[in-house]
Amino acid sequence: MNAPAKFSTSQIRSDFLAFFEGKGHTIVPSAPLVPGNDPTLLFTNSGMVQFKDVFLGAEKRSYVRAADVQRCLRAGGKHNDLDSVGYTARHHTFFEMLGNWSFGDYFKKDAIAWAWELLTQVWKLPADRLLVTVYHTDEEAFALWRDMIGIPESRIVRIGDNKGAPYASDNFWQMADTGPCGPCTEIFFDHGDHIAGGPPGSPDEDGDRFIEIWNLVFMQFDRQPDGTLVPLPAPCVDTGMGLERLAAILQHVHTNYEIDLFQALIGKASALTGITDLENKSLRVIADHIRACSFLIVDGVLPSNEGRGYVLRRIIRRALRHGWMLGVRQPFFSKMVPTLVELMGEAYPELVVAQDTVARALLAEEERFAETLDAGMKIFDEVASRSQDIIPGADAFRLYDTYGFPVDLTADIARERGMRVDMEGFEFAMERQRETARAAGKFGGGVALPADLVASMSPTVFLGYEAYDADALKVVALLKQGRPVERAEAGDEVIVFTDRTPFYAESGGQVGDSGQLSGPGVSINVTDTQKFAGQFHGHVGRISEGALALGDVLAGGIDTQRRGKTILNHSATHLLHAALREVLGTHVQQKGSLVAPDRLRFDFSHFQPFTADELAVIERKVNAEVRANHGVEVHNMAMQEALDFGAMALFGEKYGENVRVLKMGGYSTELCGGTHVTRTGDIGLFKITSEGGVSSGVRRIEAVTGQGALDYVADEERRLLEAANLLGGNTSEVVDKVRALTERQKRLERELESLKAKLASGATADLGASAIDVVGVKVVAVRLEGFDAKALRDAMDRLKQQLGDSVIVLAGASGGKVALVAGVNGSPTGKVKAGELLGHIASQIGGKGGGRPDLAQGGGEDGPALATALDGVPLWVKQHLG
């Protein structure tokens, strides 16, 4: 029996932060699991991620000492523990990292002293159960442990380089091949000699006896490209301690899944699944995965088929499959959320705020996967039964493509059965699909600027925020048929680059401007403006008169009416984005947009279709902000200042040091380089025209604004009036009259079905009397006018009951088409197959069909061939009966 827990997980968090706050540290909130402003990293996987730019010197903080509890995820990319989760004592997808930091303030002496004080005096860990490692040349750290702390040399282990490579050591940390780096010292807890395993550095170090609990990294060098280490002028400290591992030690248990937090989650999973064995690995998987999935959704990730969303989907579906293994066939995973909120909501208030969003997103994914999970498992069983120890890559791909099984889920199932997946074959099938998609997506017209031309040009100066036309625009480059030229003539299709321009180049979803460029004796009709190499505005158009050469100076003016309509739609997308987040939740993130003169299209993350009420509320909120006539403010500022200002940045986007912030009253603040109205009232009216799904987890709204919205409303009103006239009433009566018509139609359809049934019943009696005896089997093969497939099946059922041993073919003719049903009943079923018979008939009338041995369906063309085919049925049956 384990000893009672001395420190709860919540208390450990609080103790850690209180201790370091008492040592002059600023307590910093956890960063999201999605790293801000760093597209190179899939997820926050360690405590230092949010401080990366501080260590690199790219960011300054208002403090030099910090402490935090960082939520982390390792389930994709380089750091991926997913396969091991649930099957080992300490692997998790989601975990919490306790950390304290010094940015050029204290160093080794204080870091080591405070770590020892917290462990042995606050948490009362026995000193003789602790062991430390140091980098083999770090004499300073070795001496501090021995002389200041008093640890015997026998419990201080020097760790060298792996395979002799310089600084390639578990005890030497480096961010990259160059940059900040330094030695580290690690603190281990000895679980006792009753647990297998040896101390770090020994051949048995991978055992579970000695568990690392705290890593203190001393960043004291700047690694140069040639590998030399230059001392940093202000050394830093970065420490990390896994909360779950520490809790296991302080609660006197050996595995992380035995701590209070996990036991509560496992208990809830047990209650939901009916499994009472709390050691069950599937319960552990479910308990682990609910944390990862919930916090990913809190941080704006939703299940999808790409990127972070696909990692989330993989984790959810792994949990659902483990529930399926336990016999659960109804949604259960989303019901774990309230328990998680009770356990972690105090530490992470954002989880409480997003509780409903998290539960709804998980439930939607449960319902979606439930449709294919059972069928997919049957396919896996079939594949496994005909394979020996390898699941073919093509079959793994089919499970992925058709049934939504992530390949690591298939590999998980295979591993449980002593099998493995042919990953090479799977990747081959995936690549073939990608090639097909690439081929389908190819289009002409792509033009790239030559590298030498890019090197010779300066970025285009955009004047279009303040001006719609400008003079003295110097031609700095000219493309014709995609190639640089020095001169072009009237009639030539060209792309003109000038040093400055009032023309907006397509970006951020906003279409490029059109208009005119002109100079002495030359005129160019500009139909589009595109951005090249991210910084050069190319005016796409045709020279209508004269000739154009490099160095020419032009005047330019945009189509102001087109721009005017476009800016209404662009500003409306900002209000729409804010309204969506207000109504649906902060999980809503922009996934794409189109801002054109005639409409706007906005793609965003959301996990389920809208209700009519939700759409109406969103539309009302946007129009309320339009009527409020807020002034639209533009601010240029540093990226961090913009985030502090409350500006919303898009996940995964990489922004420069300075950004443009657009603020609309107190309702919307976003980073944006597009063109906009000066007041929200300029938008006039906002009207949603459609809403639908784009892909899994992504919805799309299309809308119109200004005069376009008024025209749309007028068209809708005209259609309503037309409907009212057709119904013989006024517009207020349309709904009631349509409802009455619908009810009448349903009643007439029921009466029609009843009449059809009576007709079929009467026809069946006549058909039975016309049956032909073929070797003791009744054979019926007839054409029935006006019978659809359902009426044919009903007639078939009655004939089978009436005739006993029989072979029946019924052909329902209507509108030049024929529906076919073939049935075999009683003794003939061993020799006569309905599917073969129906295929034989269908082939004669230009059709096809098939089915079971006792019942088959198909169709074809009506005509003389049908009578011939039906007349031949008795002979065909006789031949097959022998």
Curated annotation (Swiss-Prot):
Cofactor(s) the protein needs: Zn(2+)
Assigned keywords, A-Z: Aminoacyl-tRNA synthetase, ATP-binding, Cytoplasm, Ligase, Metal-binding, Nucleotide-binding, Protein biosynthesis, RNA-binding, tRNA-binding, Zinc
SUPFAM superfamilies per the UniProt record, alphabetical: Class II aaRS and biotin synthetases, Putative anticodon-binding domain of alanyl-tRNA synthetase (AlaRS), ThrRS/AlaRS common domain, Translation proteins
Chief place of localization: cytoplasm
Catalytic activity, EC: 6.1.1.7
Reactions it catalyzes: tRNA(Ala) + L-alanine + ATP = L-alanyl-tRNA(Ala) + AMP + diphosphate
Function field: Catalyzes the attachment of alanine to tRNA(Ala) in a two-step reaction: alanine is first activated by ATP to form Ala-AMP and then transferred to the acceptor end of tRNA(Ala). Also edits incorrectly charged Ser-tRNA(Ala) and Gly-tRNA(Ala) via its editing domain.
Annotated protein name in UniProt: Alanine--tRNA ligase
Gene that encodes the chain: alaS
